[in-house]
UniProtKB/Swiss-Prot annotation:
Needed co-factor(s): Mg(2+)
NCBIfam families in UniProt: polynuc_phos, pppGpp_PNP, PRK11824.1
Gene Ontology biological process terms, A to Z: mRNA catabolic process; RNA processing
Region: Disordered, residue numbers: 736-757
InterPro entries in the cross-refs: ExoRNase_PH_dom1, ExoRNase_PH_dom2, ExoRNase_PH_dom2_sf, GPSI/PNP, KH_dom, KH_dom_type_1, KH_dom_type_1_sf, NA-bd_OB-fold
Organism for this UniProt entry: Clavibacter sepedonicus
Protein name: Polyribonucleotide nucleotidyltransferase
This protein's encoding gene: pnp
Enzyme Commission number: 2.7.7.8
Length: 757
């Protein structure tokens, strides 16, 4: 039987001395009933299947495009069996959720405006090499399958990940290569043609961060990822994006279905827009000069109600069609957008009266909650973030079961966005995709400045509570987290601040004019063209996230926005520094963690049979002990003496000084035998007090049962009398101590007997 005809296209990306990476797209063999399906390969071992499906009928009463992106990680792709109880995949991993967001952001604005048929793109990870990322490949696969589906789609969209290793941007780097890199950037874009017929790559999405080892590499002389270097990275992505766009276009020419004429529901008719504009345009100009958010919203709601009533009256009078009522909200929003954007581009003034580069009033405060290990509040205008830091033993770090080679994470950042932060009601509970994404962005911004595990052996959980929201709570979370971590005593290598940039664009005199906005409001985010978040230290950028509603943004515009963001970040860092300029002393409620290194071959001895030895140390000292595979032992306790006592016992076992004949120890009787008593001198070091030596404690009298003289748990001062070839210790009592213990031992009332030979 003859199989299906397979169409393919590929792009070979040249990394110079780092070799080449081959991305291959295939169609026709898999998922043949989906409207569009593509198998995407990265070299030979990593394979994804992307399937794009579309519903047969438009969704009723939807005023948005119902697009769903799902990433299905299959454990078999990495040769694993899931670690869950049922041994099958369950809810998506955090990594899968983040990849969903990464794909959604450039794809969503590329579908035709007004589409209301449900579209679902499912990316299944079928195979992955142990050292590979699959996220950038997934962007290309999703775009390619959408290109083949027959849905009106302004692709292709290509995505690439680049790492700055030395002075070279390496495309599709491996996990192991990031150890040599100072910056890691993922860029999605498309090829556009201007009015003069010139082609360029327009940037649609950026996700970037300084790597975990960036600080040490920079100190060793590596390139510092400042704004200029980041701009170079955006330029470096363009040739690779062109190649991948060309490969997808080649596949589409071979295998794409004819474009289907799906019904499109435009948000409003021109007649509805004109009616709303005539009724509300002038007064909207006044409303959107009110600086206070609540006052502005109240005035806007009142105007919207009056305008809707006027439109309803016109409909009733037959001056407007019935559809004007259903189109009213979209038309009103569009008129509002015209008013706000026009004032920005024309006068350089924003709705709250600020200039384009002005920041709202800032406030920062630390140690705002009792008993927690670290806390802070950061406020920018009406955006208010509470940051709370919790420290614990490294054994509390997050264990990760995913396709990534990363299996644990000691720094965890969680972001919560309750409905009251915007003065509304809503669902509370498990985090949504947006909250997971915002938390991860703040985490990436801070990871490069965290102390190493060796310098600060703690698991760190950072929680950001959005108590008030009016623009960029994620960047507010970065600032609040910096304050809270310092308040908890975490020795950050440098403070980090973040700022959200916006963009407004329009055609003026035949040319597109752009205005970058610093510290955008929530309304400016909704009515603008871009959300560009930049976090960093005073010296370099640590994290970037870019989303746009446009088909793409020129890199020259992004370069200018980066420089504008640097000025704002510097100002915010000054405010943070005034609140706290160095790590505080650790809170008395925080655990004290100390470390000791032991030989790897001593790990088993320290643990003891079935954990007996280590559990005994923990029970006796009250400390928690965790042991790493490399022999690093971390000891934690709420008070210092407990930790030091545990360290002494660990050293006695794993780093002992060899006992010598003649040394005395205050030991504990741990076992009674017919021939004597075993006395514990140090953890893991026992010696035998022979029955002949026990007689000394009984005044030299014959001892039939050792239990008549000694009991388990009894303290006794002994001296080492002999160490045999196997290291076994023979003990004798020190009689001065024995005299003190006559009350508990069955000693005679007579004088001490002389020692027997």
């Amino acid at each position: 039987m003859e199989g299906p005809e397979i169409k393919f296209a590929e792009a070979v990306l040249d990394n110079g001395k780092y070799g080449t990476r081959t991305v291959r797209f295939e169609a026709g063999r898999l998922a043949q009933q989906a409207q569009g399906a593509v198998a995407a390969y990265l070299d030979e071992d990593t394979m994804l299947l992307s399937a794009t499906s579309v519903g047969k009928h438009p969704k009723d009463n939807f005023d948005f495009f119902p697009l769903t992106i799902d990433v299905e990680e299959r454990s078999y792709a990495a040769g694993k069996i899931p670690g869950s109880f049922f041994r099958r995949e369950g809810r998506p991993s955090t990594e899968a959720i983040l990849v969903c967001r990464l794909i959604d952001r450039p794809l969503r604005p590329s579908f035709i405006t007004g589409l209301r048929n449900e579209v679902q793109v499912v990316i299944t990870v079928l195979s992955i090499a142990p050292d590979e990322f699959y996220d950038s490949l997934a962007i290309n696969a999703a775009s390619a399958s959408s290109m083949l589906s027959g849905i009106p789609f302004s692709g292709p969209i290509a995505g690439v990940r680049l790492a700055l290793i030395g002075d070279q941007w390496v495309v599709f780097p491996k996990h192991s290569q990031l150890k040599e890199a100072v910056f890691d950037i993922t860029v999605a874009g498309r090829v556009v043609t201007d009015a003069q017929g010139n082609e360029d790559v327009a940037i649609m999405m950026v996700e970037a961060e300084a790597t975990e080892g960036a600080w040490d590499l920079i100190q060793a002389g590596a390139t510092k990822p400042d704004e200029a270097v980041v701009a170079q990275g955006l330029e470096a992505a363009k040739p690779f994006i062109r190649q991948l766009v060309a490969a997808q276009a080649s596949l589409a020419q071979q295998a794409a279905k004819p474009t289907v004429d799906y019904p499109v529901f435009l948000p409003y008719a021109q007649q509805s827009y004109d009616a709303v504009s005539a009724l509300a345009l002038e007064e909207l100009g006044t409303v959107y000069r009110i600086a206070d958010k609540i006052e502005r919203q109240d005035a806007d709601d009142a105007l919207k109600t009056r305008t809707k009533e006027a439109v309803a009256a016109k409909v009733e009078a037959g001056e407007l069609p019935q559809s004007a009522l259903t189109e009213f909200s979209a038309a009103y929003k569009s008129v509002t957008k015209t008013v706000v954007r026009g004032r920005i581009l024309r006068d350089g003034i924003r709705m709250d009266g600020r200039g384009l580069a002005d920041i709202r009033p800032l406030d920062a405060e630390v140690q705002v909650i009792p008993r927690v290990h670290g806390s802070a509040i950061f406020q920018r205008g009406e955006t208010q973030i509470l940051g709370v830091t919790t420290l614990n033993m490294l054994k509390m770090e997050q264990q990760i079961d995913s396709l990534s080679p990363v299996t644990k994470k000691r720094f965890m950042t969680h972001y919560n966005f309750p409905p009251y932060s915007t003065g509304e009601t809503g669902r509370v509970g498990s985090p949504k995709r947006r909250e997971i994404g915002h938390g991860f962005l703040a985490e990436r911004a801070l990871v490069p400045v965290l102390p190493s595990r060796e310098d600060f052996p703690y698991a760190i959980r950072q929680v950001s509570e959005a108590l008030g929201s009016n623009g960029s709570t994620s960047m507010g979370s970065v600032c609040a987290s910096t304050l809270s971590l310092l308040n908890a005593g975490v020795p950050l290598r440098a403070p980090v601040a973040g700022i959200a940039m916006g963009l407004v664009s329009d055609t003026v005199d035949g040319q597109v004019r752009y205005a970058a906005l610093t510290d955008i409001l929530g309304a400016e985010d909704a009515l603008g063209d871009m959300d560009f978040k930049v976090a960093g230290t005073s010296e370099f950028v640590t994290a970037i996230q870019l989303d746009t509603k446009l088909d793409g943004i020129p890199t020259s515009v992004l370069d200018g926005a980066l420089k504008q963001a640097k000025e704002a970040r510097t100002a915010i860092l000054g405010v943070l520094n005034q609140a706290i300029d160095a790590p505080d002393e650790m809170a008395p409620t925080a655990p004290r963690v100390i470390s000791v290194n032991i030989p790897v071959d001593k790990i088993g001895e320290l643990i003891g049979p079935k954990g007996k030895t280590i559990n005994a140390i923990q029970d006796e000292t009250g400390a928690d002990i965790s042991i790493e595979e490399d022999g690093a032992v971390y000891i934690g306790a709420v008070d210092g003496p407990s930790a030091e006592a545990a360290r002494a016992q660990v050293n006695a076992i794993a780093n002992p000084t060899n006992p010598e004949v003649g040394e005395s120890f205050l030991g504990t009787v741990v076992k009674i035998a017919t021939f004597g008593a075993f006395v514990s001198l140090l953890p893991g070091k026992d010696g035998l007090l022979h029955i002949s030596e026990v007689r000394k404690l009984a005044g030299g009298k014959r001892v039939e049962n050792v239990e008549d003289v000694l009991g388990v748990g009894q303290k006794i001062l002994v001296e080492i009398t002999k160490i045999d070839d196997r290291g076994k210790l023979s003990l004798a009592p020190v009689m001065e101590e024995a005299a003190d213990q006559e009350g508990s031992a069955a000693a005679s009332d007579g004088p001490e007997a002389p020692a027997e030979g």
